[in-house]
Amino acid sequence: METKLFSPWTLKGVTLKNRIVMSPMCMYSSYDRDGKLQPFHFTHYISRAQGQAGLIMVEASAVSPEGRISDQDLGIWSDEHIEGFASLNEQIKAYGTKTAIQLAHAGRKAELDGDILAPSSIPFDEQSKTPVQMSVDQIKDTVQAFQDAAVRAKKAGFDIIEIHGAHGYLINEFLSPLANHRTDDYGGSPENRYRFLREVVNAVNEVWDGPLFVRVSASDYTTKGLDIADYIGIATWLKEQGVDLIDVSSGAVVQARISTFPGYQVTFAEKIKEGAGIQTGAVGLITSGVQAEEILRNQRADLIFIGREFLRDPYFPKTAAEELRTSIEGPRQYDRAW
């Protein structure tokens, strides 16, 4: 049976063999606290390549040490990180899977010793540390850190870069009026609150010519926050800057009640795709091949990001193919059982 899920997808010379993306998920397993890959990471990612993911996106990797969510996060703030990522990429690609990395800065949600940084000195919640409001120089340094990280990602052989602008981390904090109370050029109007992300995208584009994704949280789930209409506008700006795809998640810039259900974020991806005229990735409680196929067939999104289902089933693509009554090639070593 011919399916959309297992059809190739090409962008800027990068072709995915199918539309299944392993979503970036922090593993908090850089045990030496130096941001470097551990043996666990190789097993974790390569097993999903053997399982025939079209694209594997490495978890949020901090562009600076103070940009980690925890001190056991991966990092890409140093040239010392390149060798490990290059080795991982080589081994993943041996199975015909493309690779991406998510560049990130945790902002006020960093759980680290010492000062943490944010657009404004507003803690995430009552239990969280109060961040230091970033100076303009610190903002410029962070933009440079994203650019330097993109250079390292290119040297390490990644096919795609994603900028993490979601889940209440630094870029999301600048975008949302709930976390950004600045009165300078980086706060106030929507255009000013977008300025930091604009500068990050421009800086990355100066050194990166491959596909560029941005992950966003398309709703703050509160009446005083941003909603899908705001993010259609943001996605339009991103498209104008040359961003190729919006990876559409939601929430987490403030504490909020979120009613989840299968595919609960797909409607956001669909509305951004239609409203901004840009390709999108759908993510969030997508757990079956039939569900993924429906999203693609009805043109609600272009790629399917699979998160926790990949943790439960490293061979999710095979499972999905069987469900859709089609077949896919597996590793040659497994031919006798595939």
UniProtKB/Swiss-Prot annotation:
Record-listed substrate binding positions: Y28, H164, G165, A166, H167
A matching Pfam family: Oxidored_FMN
Reaction(s) catalysed by this chain's protein: A + NADPH + H(+) = AH2 + NADP(+)
EC number: 1.6.99.1
Superkingdom: Bacteria
One GO BP: response to toxic substance
Gene3D superfamilies per record: Aldolase class I
Alphabetically ordered keywords of this record: Detoxification, Flavoprotein, FMN, NADP, Oxidoreductase
InterPro entries assigned: Aldolase_TIM, NADPH_DH_bac, OxRdtase_FMN_N, YqjM-like
Keyword Flavoprotein appears in the UniProt entry: yes
Binding site residues for FMN: S23, P24, M25, C26, A60, Q102, R215, G307, R308
Any GO MF annotation of the entry: FMN binding
Cofactor(s) recorded in Swiss-Prot or TrEMBL: FMN
Family: Belongs to the NADH:flavin oxidoreductase/NADH oxidase family. NamA subfamily.
Function: Catalyzes the reduction of the double bond of an array of alpha,beta-unsaturated aldehydes and ketones. It also reduces the nitro group of nitroester and nitroaromatic compounds. It could have a role in detoxification processes.
Subunit structure: Homotetramer.
Name this protein carries in UniProt: NADPH dehydrogenase
Organism phylogeny: Bacteria, Bacillati, Bacillota, Bacilli, Bacillales
Gene name linked to the record: namA
